[in-house]
Amino acid sequence: MLSMPRSSAHSIISLFNDESPEANEFRRLYSKLKNLYADEEMKNFLVTSAKMNEGKSTTAALLACTIARYRNTKTILVDCDLRRPRVHQLFGIPKEEGVADVLTGARKLDTCFKQTPIENLRLLTAGGVVTSPTELINSPRMHDLFSEIKFYFDTVIVDSPPVIPVTDALILSPEMDGALVVIKAGETHKEVARRAVDLMRNAGLNILGVIINNQKGVLPYYYDHKYYGYSYYNLEEKAK
């Protein structure tokens, strides 16, 4: 179970120090992912959820911080949730000059990267308000955007909209090497979570696992995606 606090500006960086429980558990999560998928070249990760308010943005932010520091590669966190963007709030930076502005041609991509206190981590925020987010994400320009991002960065973490309400996360699937699904314990019905996983599988997303987010502050557990099928097991069991 993973505790995802409601983060105010700058709190992601304050949470992410070597001694914090959050940093320790995300190091553990990253280590498990790295060991389990050592034979696969995983560079582009999508983080999503079944529905809203399950902690996906905080998860994506902490995972990006972890990979930037401990993988020691050029890492970028991209906010593709154009309806309810949150990455800029988590890091306390402006939302403007981001994904939407690049896709509409208002800005060049390399002028929109934003620095963070973590040396190897940059951000691409959601950008300005758009009237048709799905249409914009589904445009050919999105593929061009990710092609250019991958030229500049070694690891890409994408915070996408939830799967059930809109199709944006599924549209992004061709650009991703794998996906993590964040589920809120005690609130997300199993059938809703299973439906989200099925939609992602049908879209061709490689589901790396399910992160159970518990607001009560219990230390995290990471489950293989079979948790929402007929069986479940954590990574310690899978690694045996």
Language-model features: locations:
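P-loop NTP-binding module
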Residues: 1-240
